[in-house]
Each structure stands twice: as structure tokens, then as C-alpha cells.
């Protein structure tokens, strides 16, 4: 049991020493941060608009496409197609 405690203490001490050596840099090294600082406010606004997808290209949860019908079973989908075809014939 003493060996396990000694091993745990050694691991914790080594983790603290290695974490202190690595440290955090205060300089911004991220590419996206540098781009955001360089762009004027108006171009930043236009860039956000360009990134925003239109509602017809919106992907819902789990990557499923949103086609406006929601989640339907095959039976309901077949019923909807039958009703749609019936209405088309009546016209």
C-alpha cells in the first residue's frame, strides 16, 4: 500500500513540475484571432453575414436536413404522397 501512495505522490509532483515548465503564452498565436484583429468592423460584419446559412440549407440536430416536414415514418410519408396525388388529380 505504501508503494501505491509513493507512486501517486511521485506522479502528482512530476505533473506539477511539467505543468509549470509548459506554462501559457500571452501572445495570440491563433490564426483566427489574428484575422479578427486585422479586419475593420464593417468587413467583420459582412464576413458574419456571409457565413450564416440560409434557412433552406439549415441542418438540424444530428446532421439531418430540415425539409419542412419534420420527422415522419415511411407510412406517413406514403400517406402524404397519396393525398398529394389525389389533390392533383382533382384539379
Swiss-Prot record:
Q: Which residues carry this modification: Methionine amide?
A: 62
Q: Where in the cell is it found?
A: Secreted
Region annotation (Disordered) maps to 64-91
Q: What is its main location?
A: secreted
Where exactly are the transmembrane stretches of this chain? none
Protein's GO biological process: defense response; neuropeptide signaling pathway; tachykinin receptor signaling pathway
Which UniProt keywords are given for this protein, alphabetically ordered?
Amidation, Amphibian defense peptide, Cleavage on pair of basic residues, Neuropeptide, Secreted, Signal
Recorded superkingdom: Eukaryota
Q: Which residues form the signal peptide?
A: 1-19
Give the pro-peptide residues: 20-51, 66-91
Tissue-by-tissue expression: Expressed by the skin glands.
**Name the record gives this protein:** Tachykinin-like peptide
Amino acid at each position: 500500500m505504501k508503494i501505491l501512495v509513493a507512486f501517486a505522490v511521485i506522479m502528482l509532483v512530476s505533473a506539477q513540475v511539467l505543468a509549470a515548465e509548459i506554462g501559457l503564452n500571452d501572445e495570440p498565436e491563433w490564426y483566427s484571432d489574428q484575422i479578427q484583429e486585422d479586419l475593420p468592423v464593417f468587413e467583420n460584419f459582412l464576413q458574419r453575414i456571409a457565413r450564416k446559412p440560409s434557412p433552406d440549407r439549415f441542418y438540424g440536430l444530428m446532421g439531418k436536413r430540415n425539409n419542412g416536414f419534420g420527422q415522419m415514418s415511411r407510412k406517413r410519408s406514403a400517406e402524404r404522397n397519396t393525398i398529394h396525388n389525389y389533390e392533383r388529380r382533382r384539379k
